[in-house]
């Protein structure tokens, strides 16, 4: 049985939503009759992803929103939450999915690790802090999904 937040007319926001697992989830939500917002830093991917979602969404392009967001910046994520509220009236599902894995290893440049943590850890925290209060205020069933990767748990062979 699906979660009650996964209902027609409800709103799903997916960070890192213009490709991969994020786009697959957004496509699924649009197919359920939900309105979707994909937030992604990749400007080159958003238009094609939006067109794909509009072809699946019951309301077409009117049920699809895209936004350029760097989840490592709280102000970007808070601005996204405000924009979704203005466009769709609020959020029922937040999928904190944005993540990076630049070429690095345990002994790689400190800047790589700082960027990884800024996106993969702080991005989740920023999303939750920006969206959860209004989701709770709405008094409806809501859902926050935080995705991850086994790369964050294990070290791949050849990568010290």
Residues covered by each model-derived region:
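The beta1-alpha1 cofactor-binding region of Rossmann-like NAD(H)/NADP(H)-dependent oxidoreductases
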Residues: 43-44, 68-79, 110
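Conserved mid-core segment of classical short-chain dehydrogenase/reductases
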Residues: 101-114, 158
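Active-site loop immediately N-terminal to the catalytic Tyr-X3-Lys motif
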Residues: 154-160
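Residue(s) in the substrate-gating loop at a strand-loop-helix junction
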Residues: 149
């Amino acid at each position: 049985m699906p979660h009650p937040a996964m209902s027609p007319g409800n709103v799903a926001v997916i960070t890192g939503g213009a490709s991969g697992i994020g786009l697959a989830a957004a496509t699924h939500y649009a197919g359920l009759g939900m309105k979707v917002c994909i937030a992604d830093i990749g400007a080159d991917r958003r238009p094609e992803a939006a067109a794909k979602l509009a072809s699946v969404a019951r309301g077409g392009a009117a049920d699809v929103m895209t936004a350029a967001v760097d989840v490592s910046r709280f102000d970007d994520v808070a601005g996204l939450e405000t924009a979704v509220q203005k466009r769709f009236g609020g959020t029922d599902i937040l999928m904190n999915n944005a993540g990076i894995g630049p070429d690095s290893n345990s002994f790689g440049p400190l800047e790589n690790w700082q960027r990884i943590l800024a996106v993969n850890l702080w991005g989740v925290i920023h999303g939750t802090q920006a969206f959860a209060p209004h989701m709770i205020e709405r008094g409806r069933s809501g859902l926050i999904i935080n995705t991850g990767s086994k790369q964050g748990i294990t070290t791949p062979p050849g990568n010290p």
